Swiss-Prot record:
Organism: Burkholderia ambifaria (strain MC40-6)
Pfam families xrefs: Bac_DnaA, Bac_DnaA_C, DnaA_N
Protein name, as recorded: Chromosomal replication initiator protein DnaA
Gene Ontology biological process terms from the UniProt entry: DNA replication initiation; regulation of DNA replication
Domain remark text: Domain I is involved in oligomerization and binding regulators, domain II is flexibile and of varying length in different bacteria, domain III forms the AAA+ region, while domain IV binds dsDNA.
InterPro entries reported for this sequence: AAA+_ATPase (IPR003593), Chromosome_initiator_DnaA (IPR001957), Chromosome_initiator_DnaA-like (IPR020591), Chromosome_initiator_DnaA_CS (IPR018312), DnaA_C (IPR013159), DnaA_dom (IPR013317), DnaA_N_dom (IPR024633), DnaA_N_sf (IPR038454)
Gene name of the encoded protein: dnaA
Stretch list, region Domain IV, binds dsDNA: 406-525
Keyword annotations: ATP-binding, Cytoplasm, DNA replication, DNA-binding, Lipid-binding, Nucleotide-binding
Subunit structure, as described in the record: Oligomerizes as a right-handed, spiral filament on DNA at oriC.
Length: 525
């Protein structure tokens, strides 16, 4: 096995650039070879490298393995943080004793976390050295007995002895194993179903997924904060839950909280009403991972923004990870304090675009498979071609198809699909949305959908944006102010200027007229 890897590494070093070899191949290490099953296991030090090597180099490594052993070899990639050390001692533990790396489904996720908890029973959860030990990593208590909306951590024994309020487990709480894992999900508010394993990846979200995996492997180090933005139903919430679930697997006892921005606002209000800001701060400032969804809801709420600013500063200082989502680029969120915007910009900001056709097909096929249904590619392509906006719309359409098939006792076909979705397809054909126009024009001119909302003014971005505004006025019932709002909050006079400019040029420019005709036909189906 080691002889093969030396041979393989030498060949790859000659084939790749020095940077590629050092970045992707050198950190790998062979960990097991099963001659009876013809399988070779290769370890990568983190999930980001594992996924990239698997997608880019697995074919070449498999070919080299086949040539070396004169037999087909199945190359498997596994996660091992010690892979880069290339030490036999780092891989001495039998594979059967290692915890599963990628559990299947929520039940396996809970079971894996329960196993981690059992293995670490009696040991205090690890925490960054500079996190004050005044907050426990155990669980949460309520500000008042009648208030179940603000979950705060329990206090250490010496603080409880001093007369401070302590957390008491609710009815049915279990101290260990599966019950403890369930309790961790209740405290963190994570959805165990949303993992990296069932997140469908395509061009529209591959950068966001890669960044999310890197953050999950190196929380508080790689990109802090991580800011994901994009329209509704594109997978932002799925990705941040996946990060939290991965950290729960990797670090039993991690203090994690997922919260929607509206709930955070509510928590601030209740803490203010009950004069409980000390408890509020103690909780939010002591987390290992804070996941804030839809932060645009902070707009205009100055007290909430102030408290979040202090929490953000404390968490980053303690090397805790902060992850934020929004429906738009940070600088374009109205009503948010400039100092918060600057903090958002200090990390990594990644857009998630609407899914392309192939990705929409993959989403439908994956969802159908999870429902135990064999969906043909023809049906998946038919649905994907007609529904283009977001994942939620696709999943809703699939549910209608499955229900229609079940109620009528018929196999799923394109004909049945047309019947099941006739109302939805009629609406799609009759109504062209501004969002679809933006996506179609962005695809046509090879720019990002996010550029439609941005303040960027290069000609290769400004002109497609003007064309999209023109088409929005021509093909929808939206008013000029409404169109301007959908293009990053622009004034109606900006939209009017774009409409007049493109209309005038269309009458004189045959090439532009042809492009507009193609776009119109595409949008009208």
């Amino acid at each position: 096995m080691n002889d093969f890897w030396q041979h393989c590494s030498a060949l790859l070093e000659r084939e790749l650039t020095p940077q590629q070899y050092v970045t992707w191949i050198k950190p790998l290490a062979p960990v097991a070879f099963d001659a009876s099953a013809n399988t070779l296991s290769i370890a990568a030090p983190n999930r980001f490298k594992l996924d990239w090597v698997k997608s880019q180099f697995s074919g070449r490594i498999s070919d080299l393995a086949r040539d070396f052993w004169n037999a087909p070899i199945e190359v498997q990639f596994v996660l091992d943080p010690k892979a880069g050390m290339r030490s036999a001692a780092a891989h001495a533990a039998p594979a059967a004793q290692r915890a599963p790396l990628t559990p299947n489904g929520p039940a396996a996720t809970v079971a894996a976390i329960a196993a981690n908890l059992a293995a670490n029973a009696g040991a205090a959860p690890s925490a960054p050295a500079d996190v004050p030990m005044t907050a426990s990593a155990a669980a949460a208590h309520h500000l008042n007995a009648d208030d179940a909306d603000i979950d705060l951590p329990s206090l250490p024994a010496h603080e409880a002895a001093a007369g401070r309020r302590t957390w008491r487990p609710g009815p049915g709480a279990a101290p260990a194993n599966g019950g403890e894992a369930d309790s961790m999900y209740e405290r963190s508010k994570l959805n165990p179903v949303l993992t990296f394993d069932n997140f469908v990846t395509g061009k529209a979200n591959q950068l966001a997924r890669a960044a999310a995996i890197q953050v999950a492997d190196n929380p508080g180090i790689s990109y802090n904060p991580l800011f994901l933005y994009g329209g509704v139903g594109l997978g932002k919430t799925h990705l941040i839950h996946a990060i939290g679930n991965q950290l729960l697997l990797d670090k039993a006892g991690a203090r994690i909280r997922y919260i929607h921005a509206e709930q955070y606002v509510s928590d601030v209000v209740k803490a203010y009403q009950r004069k409980a800001f000390d408890d509020f701060k103690r909780y939010y400032h002591s987390l290992d991972l804070l996941l804030i969804d839809d932060i645009q809801f902070f707009s205009g709420k100055s007290r909430t923004q102030e408290e979040f600013f202090y929490a953000f500063e404390a968490l980053v200082a303690n090397k805790a990870q902060v992850i934020i989502t929004s429906d738009t680029y940070p600088k374009e969120i109205s009503g948010i304090d400039d100092r918060l915007i600057s903090r958002f910009d200090s990390g990594l900001t990644v857009a998630i675009e609407p899914p392309e056709l192939e990705m929409r097909v993959a989403i439908l096929m994956r969802k159908a498979q999870s429902e135990g249904v064999n969906l043909s590619e023809d049906v998946a392509f038919f649905v994907a071609k007609h529904l283009r906006s977001n994942v939620r719309e696709l999943e809703g359409a699939l549910r209608k198809i499955l229900a229609y098939s079940k109620f009528h006792g018929r196999e799923i076909s394109i004909e049945l699909t047309k019947e099941a979705l006739k109302d939805l397809l009629t609406v799609q054909n009759r109504q062209i949305s501004v969002e679809n126009i933006q996506k179609t024009v962005a695809d046509f001119y090879n720019i990002k959908v996010a550029d439609m909302y941005s303040k960027k003014r290069p000609a290769n971005i400004a002109r497609p944006r003007q064309i999209a505004m023109y088409l929005a006025k021509e093909l929808t019932q939206k008013s000029l102010p409404e169109i301007g709002e959908l293009f990053g909050g622009r004034d109606h006079t900006t939209v009017l200027h774009a409409v007049r400019k493109i209309a005038d040029e269309r009458s004189k420019d045959a090439q532009l007229n042809h492009e507009l005709h193609v776009l119109e036909q595409t949008l009208k189906g």
